């Protein structure tokens, strides 16, 4: 299991991303607008840099919902490979069966 502090850190990042999403997208739209003035683009770039680092979605890490494990993560299920296998063996995941040929 992942440390509790790592899970809390990820939760904090998720909240920051949600809080600054609108502001971040507005600033990016100004920066990418070909008709915008260079000064406006420069100001938008500076404001974007002043936002918290953790408010950027690329700093988030997908983690298992049960254990917090960061590797071997299956997006479709939100679980790590280990917990997904355990759930499949118990029959908790509908339609998922062990391969046999």
Swiss-Prot record:
Name any GO cellular component annotation: cytoplasm
- What keywords is this UniProt entry annotated with? Ribonucleoprotein, Ribosomal protein, RNA-binding, rRNA-binding
Do you know which PROSITE patterns this protein is assigned to? RIBOSOMAL_S14
Q: Does the keyword Zinc apply?
A: no
One term of GO molecular function: structural constituent of ribosome
Q: Which Pfam families match?
A: Ribosomal_S14
**Description of how the protein assembles with itself and partners:** Part of the 30S ribosomal subunit. Contacts proteins S3 and S10.
What is the recorded name of this protein? Small ribosomal subunit protein uS14
Tell me what organism the protein belongs to. Alcanivorax borkumensis (strain ATCC 700651 / DSM 11573 / NCIMB 13689 / SK2)
The upper taxonomy is: Bacteria, Pseudomonadati, Pseudomonadota, Gammaproteobacteria, Oceanospirillales
Q: Which gene encodes it?
A: rpsN
């Amino acid at each position: 299991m992942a440390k509790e502090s790592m899970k809390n850190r990820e939760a904090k990042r998720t909240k920051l991303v949600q809080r600054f999403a609108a502001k971040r997208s507005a600033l990016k739209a100004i920066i990418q607008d070909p008709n915008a003035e260079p000064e406006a683009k420069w100001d938008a770039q500076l404001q974007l840099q002043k936002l918290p680092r953790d408010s950027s979605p690329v700093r988030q890490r997908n983690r298992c919902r049960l254990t917090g494990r960061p590797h071997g993560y299956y997006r479709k299920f939100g679980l790590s490979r280990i917990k997904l296998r355990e759930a499949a063996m118990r029959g908790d995941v509908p339609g998922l069966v062990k391969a046999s040929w």
